[in-house]
Curated annotation (Swiss-Prot):
This is Ubiquinone biosynthesis protein coq4, mitochondrial. Component of a multi-subunit COQ enzyme complex, composed of at least coq3, coq4, coq5, coq6, coq7 and coq9. GO terms for biological process: ubiquinone biosynthetic process. Residues 1-7 form a transit peptide. The keyword Protein transport does not apply. Pathway: Cofactor biosynthesis; ubiquinone biosynthesis. It comes from Aspergillus niger (strain ATCC MYA-4892 / CBS 513.88 / FGSC A1513). Keywords: Lyase, Membrane, Metal-binding, Mitochondrion, Mitochondrion inner membrane, Transit peptide, Ubiquinone biosynthesis, Zinc. Zn(2+) binds at residues 171-172, 175, 187. Its cofactor is Zn(2+). Lyase that catalyzes the C1-decarboxylation of 4-hydroxy-3-methoxy-5-(all-trans-polyprenyl)benzoic acid into 2-methoxy-6-(all-trans-polyprenyl)phenol during ubiquinone biosynthesis. It is a peripheral membrane protein.
Length: 290
């Protein structure tokens, strides 16, 4: 989905914590010692917000509905991703990293993707066909930054929390190598691909937002981009195991081939051509009416 990248993390945490504090029934909140099944466990790492069963369920449902109503709410999308990734899916992704040499190295090194760690001015100076230049060009074209990803809060296992953080910070690389833009139609196409590659539930649930697309956009999504996502998502390697920081100088076409990713049709170009066609048709209609 298209993300609104300017929401502060502090505001995000405050809103979600207020929501969770209201989610539990009053009868449970009024007891000084609630029954153990509803106790909130202690945090496992800095910034961790442990949730009990009721809170996790409320967060999953509330954030999913809120994100569907407003696909630009990046904070709700992130919360939904964390709340629905456990108990199975994030562990499966972690195990995929543990079973791969590069994945294990990433888990040992725990790199973070920011404009400082990637040195964006350097990436802009790389040859045009490199992964790093493609990534920097995509960031500049879409007007986004790698510095605005929320930190993971609601995943209990500390190692799995890093896996989710890594997925979140690598998301823009997936955009860059596929060329998909950040408006809703492009995000949904990428989320479909990500679901088949990662099995993270939030990525699949995102497709419900297709009901908010215009008819032409929805038809294009289902006829062009979902078939592409199916082909590429099922045959591509686990993208979580790509050490992006080490392939920045690699040819992007060569990397796509190695990963098994087919580049989809240029969505921006398709939309531009449709606009031009409609403009010409309108001009012809006006000329005939004179």
């Amino acid at each position: 989905m298209t993300v609104l990248r300017t929401r502060s993390a502090v505001q995000h945490a405050r809103e979600l914590n207020n929501f969770l504090s209201c989610a539990a029934p009053l009868s449970l909140r009024s007891h000084s010692r609630p029954i153990s099944g509803f106790n909130r466990p202690p945090p496992n790492y800095p910034g961790h917000v442990p949730l009990n069963f009721v809170e996790r369920g409320a967060l999953a449902v509330g954030s999913a509905v809120g994100a569907l109503l407003n696909p630009r709410r990046a904070d709700l999308i992130a919360a939904c991703g964390e709340a629905t990734a456990t108990p199975y899916f994030i562990y499966r992704l972690r195990d995929a990293m543990l079973s791969d040499p590069t994945g294990r190295q990433i888990l040992r090194d725990r790199p973070r993707i920011t404009s400082e760690t990637l040195k964006l001015p350097y990436l802009r100076s790389l040859p045009e066909n490199t992964v790093g230049r493609t990534y920097a060009t995509w960031l500049d074209r879409e007007g986004v930054s790698p510095d605005t990803r929320d930190n993971v809060q609601y995943i209990d296992d500390e190692e799995c929390a890093y896996v989710m953080q890594r997925y979140r910070e690598c998301h823009d690389f997936y955009h860059a190598v596929t060329g998909l833009p950040i408006f809703v139609e492009g995000e949904l196409a990428l989320k479909a691909f990500e679901f088949l590659n990662t099995l993270i539930p939030m990525t699949g649930l995102s497709l419900f937002a297709s009901v908010r697309l215009k008819p032409a956009e929805r038809e294009r999504l289902f006829s062009i981009y979902l078939p592409w996502a199916l082909r590429s998502g099922l045959r591509s390697k686990e993208l979580i195991n790509v050490y992006w920081e080490k392939v920045l100088e690699k040819d992007v076409g060569e990397l796509r081939e190695e990963l098994g990713i087919e580049r989809p049709p240029d969505m921006r170009e398709i939309r531009r051509m449709i606009r031009m066609q409609k403009k010409r048709e309108k001009e012809l209609m006006e000329q005939r009416g004179q």
